[in-house]
Amino acid sequence: MFDNEEGQGPKSTFTTYMAEGDQLFQRGEYVKAVESFTTALTLQPDDKNCLVSRSRCYVKLGDAENALKDAESSLKDNKNYFKGLYQKAEALYTMGDFEFALVYYHRGHKLRPELQEFRLGIQKAQEAIDNSVGSPSSVKLVNKGDLSFFHNGVHPQNLNPSNKKESKKHSKKTDKGEKTAKQLLGELYSDREYLKKLLQDEDLVKCKIRSGERVQDLIVGSISYLDTRMAFWQQQKPIYARQRDRKLMQQQWSKVLHKPPSDPTRYVLSSLEEIDTALSAGYTESGLNKARELMKVVKDWSEDALPNKNEVLGNLHSYIGNALMDLGNMDRALHHHEKDLELAKKCDLTDSKSRALDNIGRVYARIGKFQQAIEVWEKKLPLACGGLEKAWLFHEIGRCYLELKRYMEARDYGSRSLMAADDISDEKWQLNASVLMAQAELKLSNYKASVLHFERALERAKLLQDDSASEAIQKALCEARLRVTQ
C-alpha cells in the first residue's frame, strides 16, 4: 500500500490506512500497524482516534515514551477525551509511573464509570504501587507494638499467653512490614534497630542527660521521628525509586550489549530470576521483553564463556513461549516451545524435555487440538516425576479424551489421576479426578457410578470450602440422580 518512489506520499485514504492498522494490530503485527497509523496521520495529523491507536501499538512494543507522546497529543484539544486518558494511563503504567497512571485511571473512571477498563486499571495500578515497596496496609506506622510496651511500663517478656497467640498470628505481616521498613529507611534501618535495642537496657533508659531529659524519651522520640519519615517515604519512594532503578537497568543492558559481564553465569541466573519474577507477578510483556533481550545477548556468547548456553536458551524459549501463550499468540508460543524441545533433545536434558512437552501439550489443548495434545502428553508420561505431576497429567489427558467423546479412555485416565492424587492425599486433585470420572460415567450411561463419583467430589469440594465447585457439582449430581430413577 506504500509507494516506493521517492517524493510520493500515501496512495490511499485515511480510512483505509486506519482499517489496515487495526487489522495489523489485531494480528499482533505492531510494527507494521505503527507504519499504517503513521501514514494515516500524515493525512490527518490531529486525528484523536488514530493517535490513540498508534499509542496502543507503542505500548505493545514496549516504547512507552512514544506511547505517552501520542496519548498526550490526543488530549491536546479535549482534556476529557476518555480514550486519550485511558491510553495516557496505560503508557504511564508501562513506564512504571504507577502513581500518575492511577491518577489518569481515576479521571477516566469519573468520566466513564461504566467502562470496565478504568476499573481494572485502578486495580492493577494500586496493586503495583503496593508491590513496589510493600503494601501500606501491612505496616502500621504508629507508636504501637514494640514502643507501646515502654510507654506502658510493660516489658515484652511479660506478655500473657493470649497476646503471644495473637503475635504469632500476625508474624507474617510483621516480617513483611520489616522488609518494607528496610527498603524505605535504607542505612537508617540499622540505626532504628540499634535504638530499639538501647530501649531494652533498663539501666540506660533510666538515666538523664545534663539538660534533665530522660534517655528513654530521647530514644523513643528518635524512633518516632524515623517512623514518621517512613510513613512519608512510603508514599514518595515508589516514583523516584523506580526511575532510578529503570535508569540503572538501562545502563546495565547497554553495558552488556557492548561488553560481556565478567561472570556470565551469575549474570544469566540473575536475569532469569528477574524474568521469572516479572512473569509470576503478571507483568507478562515486561518479562517477555527481558527474555528477548537476554536471548540476544546469550546467542552472541560462545560456549566457552557460557558452558550451559543451550540450556539457558531452552529456558528462555520456554519463558517466551509461556508469555506469548498468556498474550494469546498461540502460533508463536508453539514455535518457542518446540525450540525448547529441540534443544532439550540435542543436549539430552530430561527435565527440559519434560517441560517442553508439557507446554506444547497445553498450547494444543488451548487451541482445541485435543488429539495432538494427547499424543504430546503421552510422550511426557514416562518423564513425569512425583504424584502431583502425574495426577495433573492423567487428568489433562482424560479431559482431552472427554472433549473427543472417547469416554472410556476419559474414565480410565480419570481413575489413574485419582490413584495418583490418593497417593499424595491431595484433595484438590481428588476432587478434579472424581468429577472427570463422574462426567465420563454419565456419558457412558453408567448413572449409578456417576452419582457415586459426584457424591465423592461434592464431599471434597465441601472440605476445601470451594462454594462454586460445590454448587456446580450439586447441579450435576441432581441430573445424574434423575437419570437413575428414569
UniProtKB/Swiss-Prot annotation:
<feature type="region of interest" description="Disordered">
    <location>
        <begin position="153"/>
        <end position="180"/>
    </location>
</feature>
<feature type="repeat" description="TPR 5">
    <location>
        <begin position="354"/>
        <end position="387"/>
    </location>
</feature>
<feature type="repeat" description="TPR 6">
    <location>
        <begin position="391"/>
        <end position="424"/>
    </location>
</feature>
<keyword id="KW-0677">Repeat</keyword>
<dbReference type="GO" id="GO:0005737">
    <property type="term" value="C:cytoplasm"/>
</dbReference>
<dbReference type="GO" id="GO:0061371">
    <property type="term" value="P:determination of heart left/right asymmetry"/>
</dbReference>
<comment type="subunit">
    <text>Component of the outer dynein arm-docking complex along with ODAD1, ODAD2 and ODAD3.</text>
</comment>
<dbReference type="GO" id="GO:0005856">
    <property type="term" value="C:cytoskeleton"/>
</dbReference>
<comment type="function">
    <text>Component of the outer dynein arm-docking complex (ODA-DC) that mediates outer dynein arms (ODA) binding onto the doublet microtubule. Plays an essential role for the assembly of ODA-DC and in the docking of ODA in ciliary axoneme.</text>
</comment>
<dbReference type="GO" id="GO:0060271">
    <property type="term" value="P:cilium assembly"/>
</dbReference>
<dbReference type="InterPro" id="IPR011990">
    <property type="entry name" value="TPR-like_helical_dom_sf"/>
</dbReference>
<keyword id="KW-0206">Cytoskeleton</keyword>
<protein>
    <recommendedName>
        <fullName>Outer dynein arm-docking complex subunit 4</fullName>
    </recommendedName>
</protein>
<dbReference type="InterPro" id="IPR040111">
    <property type="entry name" value="ODAD4"/>
</dbReference>
<dbReference type="Pfam" id="PF13432">
    <property type="entry name" value="TPR_16"/>
</dbReference>
<dbReference type="GO" id="GO:0036158">
    <property type="term" value="P:outer dynein arm assembly"/>
</dbReference>
<keyword id="KW-0802">TPR repeat</keyword>
<feature type="repeat" description="TPR 1">
    <location>
        <begin position="14"/>
        <end position="47"/>
    </location>
</feature>
<feature type="repeat" description="TPR 4">
    <location>
        <begin position="314"/>
        <end position="347"/>
    </location>
</feature>
<dbReference type="Pfam" id="PF13424">
    <property type="entry name" value="TPR_12"/>
</dbReference>
<feature type="repeat" description="TPR 7">
    <location>
        <begin position="431"/>
        <end position="464"/>
    </location>
</feature>
<feature type="repeat" description="TPR 2">
    <location>
        <begin position="49"/>
        <end position="81"/>
    </location>
</feature>
<keyword id="KW-0966">Cell projection</keyword>
<feature type="repeat" description="TPR 3">
    <location>
        <begin position="82"/>
        <end position="115"/>
    </location>
</feature>
<dbReference type="GO" id="GO:0032474">
    <property type="term" value="P:otolith morphogenesis"/>
</dbReference>
<keyword id="KW-0963">Cytoplasm</keyword>
<dbReference type="GO" id="GO:0003341">
    <property type="term" value="P:cilium movement"/>
</dbReference>
<dbReference type="InterPro" id="IPR019734">
    <property type="entry name" value="TPR_rpt"/>
</dbReference>
<dbReference type="GO" id="GO:0042995">
    <property type="term" value="C:cell projection"/>
</dbReference>
